[in-house]
Amino acid sequence: CDSVRALDESGVDVVMPIIHFGTEYREMPDSWQEKCVDLLFEAGADVIVGGHPHVVEPMEIREIRNDDGTTRTGYVIYSLGNFISSQRYENGVMKDIGLIMDMDFEKQNGETRLTGWRFAPTYVYWTDDVIGVVPVVEAYENRDAYSFLSEKDWARIEDSYHKTIQTLTKITDCPYNIVDYEYNFEISE
């Protein structure tokens, strides 16, 4: 937290720690993750990106009270899941799903704010010759372009198309739409 505090006090536009934390294969943040997020926001983090659980965990938008009594908005994604790995779906654990995160920031009058937050879910598929990654929403909406995928792959893509957004919004039920094959969350100040 000292590094985060030092960065915040240095006047950088955005403080975004990337944290390796959480319980493997658990789709909700554990108490240690929640405590770390509290401390990082308290130290001045604006956006927190997590990894390690090997599954997608929720995003959260929080109102943070600063020491001077003012408030600001903080953003956290507890886990981006697995982008590419040899871990497979089993017993309801979505170890074959990951997220690509995209954020837009705008600076006006010396203030930087988040104006866009998007997630593109990904699926890891296997054949005898290839381990690859496909974008879930694009594949779901353009099945013909991904004809090399097996029926098992299609079942996983359909499941993750629906379940990923449910997981992302378990803590903060934020309005979203799908734009360019990404879950696009509405950010308001």
Residue ranges and their predicted role:
Residues 1-189:
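Acidic, metal/ion-coordinating pockets
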